[in-house]
From Swiss-Prot:
Quaternary structure and partners: Interacts with PTPRG.
Source organism of this protein record: Rattus norvegicus
All residue ranges annotated as the Fibronectin type-III domain in the record: 600-698, 703-800, 805-901, 902-998
GO biological process entries: cell adhesion; neuron projection development
Source species taxonomy: Eukaryota, Metazoa, Chordata, Craniata, Vertebrata
Disulfide-bonded cysteines: C50-C100, C144-C196, C249-C297, C339-C386, C431-C479, C521-C577
Keyword Lipoprotein annotated: yes
UniProt topology in membrane: Lipid-anchor; GPI-anchor
Protein name, entry field: Contactin-3
Extent of the signal sequence: 1-19
Region (Disordered): 684-714
Length: 1028
């Protein structure tokens, strides 16, 4: 169909306007859904939702049962946006099918149908029900007969009084299909009144029917009879896809029948099928095509069985397989628009345009649901809906058809301003303006029309393809596009550059761990192009910031050299230098092999174990690009300090060997093994340890060491040794064999010590002579046998303790804190042992003997000084001898009183006077207090300042004269002497070296004395009138 020029101009304008404003036909966001309104609800309105988007915004109208709803005339209806509000819904007027229409300037769409129903439940008619008489053992069905209602119901039965409901079990069943109560076998306890209770699942309203009395007949008990199926499902039952299907089945009979289910074709039930209410209900959730077929309910008791059969058929409402999609096309084109749905039965199709049935004509046809329109024009634009329906439902799919008419326009898809390519390459210059219908295109280079030739082709989409580009192809290219509505043009500058070349490429390298290298990558490129370098390692782009510790790009603007520092094994692999410009890219690759010490061997296993050997095997780890030349085996036990190298056979394990025998192991010890590989680079990491294994048992081979003994109590022979370490015991059940005999006797006495940790054995016998020599040896044994004995050594039996007390005990005080005790030695025979010494026990007269203190002295001493005593206090003491066998009796007790303490007052006002080499000292007399010892004299202590040896001068006067050499400082102090010891020292006085013929001083002048620097020998002479 040809259009006039006026129509063309108008269509072009409309197409441009539509593009500018982005107009869009209505699209539903919300559609109404089926609703059930409870009659008598407190809510006095119901809302049916409808919302659509579009530009311009849609407006709405509604239909009920195909007739328009005029909200301006009927005030029970109100529109809120697109939502329809029904005020005070009435089941007589408002029940039916509702549809929403959304319209804007581009067209109209219709919503799916939404059914509004009203749920109600009326009361039972008030009439008495006849009583039901049955014999005991007979089955019975009590009918419910629900009142008029709308909406789904649930049923229950009350026994006698509400709310005592009948409990369902294998004997009693309430059908949710019929509402009836089924009792398979009546018992006397069933007698009573039964009331049917009906509940609306929508409104929750509940009504009760009239009671039905159930009584027993008096003509006897019903005998046994085979099952009679009273409740069964239909012979044919359609089931919707995805629904939950419930089949009920119940039988009367005596005994009470057992209900079972099966498929007639013998196929087992899938796991989703559930049996409920004591098998009275078969439930199939999410019903699918494979669940169709014949099902059987079998009721069986001891008198026989009965079977009910029914077939489930499958149906599915239509559902979309392919939805409509918006179409935008040009005038005079053809349209093929397909929507596809599935369902059972197979859906049929019809189409709407702007809410009305599509009118078919010669160029508009529908076939198998697909719409075809030939020679499109703008008036074909609008909103289209495909409806798929079968007897179970219908569905809608909506889309917009835009038929465009416009002149070529490059604004939406402009041509590239510049394209850069290299000499010899292929380039395509695009020319894709928007145009309806599609524009025809031709090209110009400068002012010259481009013609097709061997290297140049005009493409069907309007593009220009140039192969094997040369420098002469560079220039400005213009595409001129034209259709019946107008024409437009666009330009592209083609820039032709020289190709980029790598002039110094990286090469394969072989390095060792820890080295640093540079992989070169230098290029020659067109100066018009910016260049960028990138390195890939094993296909991954190198991040120089993240991996800067190892990788760095070095070189100038035309170089992308890669420096790799401190190379590690992980750096082995393929390196690619990628050079990229705006028009091309080149790359070059090199392999880097990094050699290092080998990785740990793997799968170390102990294949065979004996008492002293272990057969090992392992597999090779990574060789780190350097072949393994040797292996070493290490072992660890609970007794070793870390891992130790062990001996193997072969002694030297070469790099091709994967097995070795470890020798010289200790029996009955738990070992772990590991293997270390070495190559010419060095030793690698050790393998993971093998599993722990224990060597087999063997007889012990090591005897105890340090065998000795002695001591103990009378009539004992004590034998000691160092226990054999656990790792040398060679097996379980380890112990010691102790052998001994008196010196000169040939027969050994043997005994066993079963504890491997026991280092001692004591032999007791009254016949043992004290301190007699024995030959002793200690051997070993375990579960596998006996081992060697230690060398024979001599051990003496226990000594005899002393039996005599020391005699002639005496004690006298030495000072205020010391008492000397003396005694005579006891008579002693060497055959009785060795006398170790004496023990002196002492206590004061205020203490108890049991809490006494003790002092021990060697056996050759006959006196002891007790120190640290309290002053002026009587102490009691006794002495006894002792040896290794024990201690003898104590001597008689003696006592002595410590002297009073020395005076606490030091000699005061010490003054000195030096003449020539003489020094005259004077001091004040010290007077003792009542509780202090009397002063018996004084001691003058003096030494040179450079020596520590102190000289002492005793005197009973308060003065002393010293003859001292010159040229030396002297330190002097004075103490009082008493029977209780020396008193408190005076302050030290320093006498400087004598440099003049006359000098004097006192203790108050000490701080003015300067130290001397020389050292001379001290010659001390003193002249005193001492009385001794």
């Amino acid at each position: 169909m040809m259009l006039s020029w006026k129509q063309l101009i108008l269509l072009s304008f409309i197409g441009c306007l539509a593009g500018e404003l982005l107009l869009q036909g209505p699209v539903f966001v919300k559609e109404p859904s089926n609703s059930i309104f409870p009659v008598g609800s407190e809510d006095k309105k119901i809302t049916l939702n409808c919302e659509a988007r579009g530009n311009p915004s849609p407006h709405y109208r509604w239909q009920l049962n195909g007739s328009d709803i005029d909200t301006s005339l009927d005030h029970r209806y109100k529109l809120n946006g697109g939502n329809l509000i029904v005020i005070n819904p009435n089941r007589n007027w408002d029940t039916g099918s509702y549809q929403c229409f959304a319209t804007n300037s581009l067209g109209t769409i219709v919503s799916r149908e939404a059914k509004l129903q009203f749920a109600y439940l009326e009361n039972f008619k008030s009439r008495m029900r006849s009583r039901v008489s049955v014999r005991e053992g007979q089955g019975v069905v009590l009918l419910c007969g629900p009142p008029p209602h709308s909406g789904e119901l649930s049923y229950a039965w009350v026994f006698n009084e509400y709310p005592s409901f009948v409990e369902e079990d294998s004997r009693r069943f309430v059908s949710q299909e019929t509402g009836h109560l089924y009792i398979a076998k009546v018992e006397p306890s069933d007698v009573g009144n039964y009331t049917c209770v009906v509940t609306s699942t929508v409104t929750n309203a509940r009504v009760l029917g009239s009671p039905t009395p159930l009584v027993l007949r008096s003509d006897g008990v019903m005998g046994e009879y085979e099952p009679k199926i009273e409740l069964q499902f239909p012979e044919t039952l359609p089931a919707a896809k995805g629904s939950t299907v419930k089949l009920e089945c119940f039988a009367l009979g005596n005994p009470v029948p057992q209900i079972n289910w099966r498929r007639s074709d013998g196929m087992p039930f899938p796991t989703k099928i559930k049996l409920r209410k004591f098998n009275g209900v078969l439930e199939i959730p999410n019903f699918q095509q494979e669940d169709t077929g014949s099902y059987e309910c079998i009721a069986e008791n001891s008198r026989g069985k009965n079977v009910a059969r029914g077939r489930l058929t499958y149906y599915a409402k239509p559902y979309w397989v392919q939805l409509l999609k918006d179409v935008e096309t040009a005038v005079e084109d053809s349209l093929y628009w397909e929507c596809r749905a599935s369902g059972k039965p197979k859906p049929s199709y019809r189409w709407l345009k702007n809410g009305d049935a599509l009118v078919l004509e010669e160029r508009i046809q529908i076939e198998n649901g697909a719409l075809t329109i030939a020679n499109l024009n703008v008036s074909d634009s609008g909103m289209f809906q495909c409806i798929a329906e079968n007897k179970h439902g219908l569905i809608y799919s909506s889309a917009e058809l835009k038929v465009l008419a416009s002149a070529p326009d490059f604004s939406r898809n402009p041509m590239k301003k510049m394209i850069q390519v290299q000499v010899g390459s292929l380039v395509i210059l695009d020319c894709k303006p928007s145009a309806s219908p599609r524009a025809l295109s031709f090209w110009k280079k400068g002012d010259t029309v481009v013609r097709e030739q061997a290297r140049i082709s005009l493409l069907n989409d309007g593009g220009l393809k140039i192969m094997n580009v040369t420098k002469a192809d560079a220039g400005i290219y213009t595409c001129i596009a034209e259709n019946q509505f107008g024409k437009a043009n666009g330009t592209t500058q083609l820039v032709v550059t020289e190709p980029t070349r790598i002039i110094l490429a990286p090469s394969n390298m072989d390095v060792a761990v820890g080295e640093s290298i540079i992989l070169p990558c230098q290029v020659q490129h067109d100066p018009l192009l910016d260049i960028m370098f990138a390195w890939y390692f094993n296909g991954t782009l190198t991040d120089f910031k993240k991996d800067g510790s190892h990788f760095e790009k070095v070189g100038g603007s035309s170089s992308g050299d890669l420096m790799i520092r401190n190379i590690q094994l992980k750096h082995s692999g393929k390196y690619v230098c990628m050079v990229q410009t705006g028009v091309d890219s080149v790359s070059s690759a090199a392999e880097l092999i990094v050699r290092g010490s080998p990785g740990p061997p793997e799968n170390v296993k102990v294949d065979e174990i004996t008492d002293t050997t272990a057969q090992l095997s392992w597999t090779e780890g990574t060789d780190s690009h350097s072949p393994v030349i040797s292996y070493a085996v290490q072992a660890r036990t609970p007794f070793s300090v870390g891992w130790q190298n062990v001996r193997t056979v072969p002694e030297a394990i070469d790099g091709k060997t994967r097995t070795a025998t470890v020798v010289e192991l200790n029996p009955w010890v738990e070992y772990e093994f590991r293997v270390v590989a070495s190559n010419k680079i060095g030793g690698g990491e050790p393998s993971l340890p093998s599993e722990k294994v224990r060597t087999e048992e063997a007889a012990p081979e090591v005897a105890p060491s340090e065998v000795s003994g002695g001591g103990g109590s009378r009539s004992e022979l004590v034998i000691t040794w160092d226990p054999v370490p656990e790792e040398l015991q060679n097996g379980g059940g380890f112990g010691y064999v102790v052998a001994f005999r008196p010196l000169g006797v040939t027969t050994w006495i043997q005994t066993v010590v079963t504890s491997p940790d026991n280092p001692r054995y004591v032999f007791r016998n009254e016949s043992i002579v004290p301190f007699s020599p024995y030959e002793v040896k200690v051997g070993v044994y375990n579960n596998k046998g006996e081992g060697p004995f230690s060398p024979v050594t001599t051990v003496f039996s226990a000594e005899e303790e002393p039996t005599v007390a020391p005699s002639h005990i005496s004690a006298h005080s030495l000072s205020s804190s010391e008492i000397e005790v003396s005694w005579n030695t006891i008579p002693w025979k060497s055959s009785n042992g060795r006398l170790l010494g004496y023990e002196v026990r002492y206590w004061n007269n205020g203490g108890e003997e049991e809490s006494s203190s003790k002092v021990k002295v060697a056996g050759n001493q006959t006196s002891a000084v007790l120190r640290g005593l309290k002053s002026n206090l009587a102490y009691y003491t006794a002495v006894r001898a002792y040896n290794t066998a024990g201690a003898g009796p104590f001597s008689a007790t003696v006592n002595a009183t410590t002297k009073k303490t020395p005076p606490s007052q030091p000699p005061g006002n010490v003054v000195w006077n030096a003449t020539d080499t003489k020094v005259l000292l004077n001091w004040e007399q010290v007077k003792a207090l009542e509780n202090e010892s009397e002063v018996t004299g004084y001691k003058v202590f003096y030494r040179t300042s450079s020596q520590n040896n102190v000289q002492v001068l005793n005197t009973n006067k308060t003065s002393a004269e010293l003859l001292l050499p010159i040229k030396e400082d002297y330190i002097i102090e004075v103490k009082a002497t008493t029977d209780g010891g020396d008193g408190t020292s005076s302050e030290q006085i320093r006498i400087p070296r004598i440099t003049s013929m006359d000098a004097r001083g006192s203790t108050s002048a000490i701080s003015d004395i300067h130290p001397v620097s020389g050292y001379i020998s001290v010659l001390l002479f003193f002249i005193v009138n001492a009385l001794w």
